[in-house]
Amino acid sequence: MKTSKFIVYTVSIALMFTAGFLIGNTKDFKMPLCSFSASDNVIPVVNSNYFNITYNEISNAKESIDIILYEFKWYDSNNSVVKIRESLIDAAERGVSIRIILDQSEYWDQITELSKENKKTGDYLAGKGILVKYDSLKQTTHNKMLIIDNEIVILGSHNWGYSAFTKNNEASVMIKDKGTAEYYGDYFENLWNNL
């Protein structure tokens, strides 16, 4: 448990440092894949590197994928978000259990455009056999997190939209640690069971 707490603290500090660095450097730049990490189990994931890492982890999932997202944009044309969406369907067809929690929000009694896109994406995935739930209209779920095979957690600032995958300055982290995955898995279960 001490190791898991250490990893959570280390990741939090790394995210704050990375976010501060990126905020101060807003020029368009591409970061190479990280060649260092706080440990072999904590891997910084910034900017467009997120797509490849997330896509590969989804493609290699064997048992389960649990996802919480603020935004999972809908696109008709083929792009990185469509590839992620289709990789989830492929995983479900391989027998991987997939559950997704998406935000739906209402402001001034109006359903937001973001909520409409999440609903379109969620309904499409549900039609393909993926379990999808939405939070309450009065609650904002701002998470960007996925848990793969109860062993890997990817979390940070990346929404699932084309700009986040290709253009934005974003900072996330991949943690390969069962204790950390269990902690966030419990968090996911609590949200899932209360929707």
Language-model regions, residue ranges each:
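Ser/Thr/Pro/Gly-rich low-complexity linker/stalk segments immediately outside membranes or between
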Residues: 25-41
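Alpha-helical scaffolding within the catalytic cores
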Residues: 49-54, 84-86
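Solvent-exposed loop/turn segments at secondary-structure junctions
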Residues: 51, 71-75, 104-108, 138-141, ...
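Signature of lipid phosphatidyltransferase scaffolds
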Residues: 144-148, 152-195
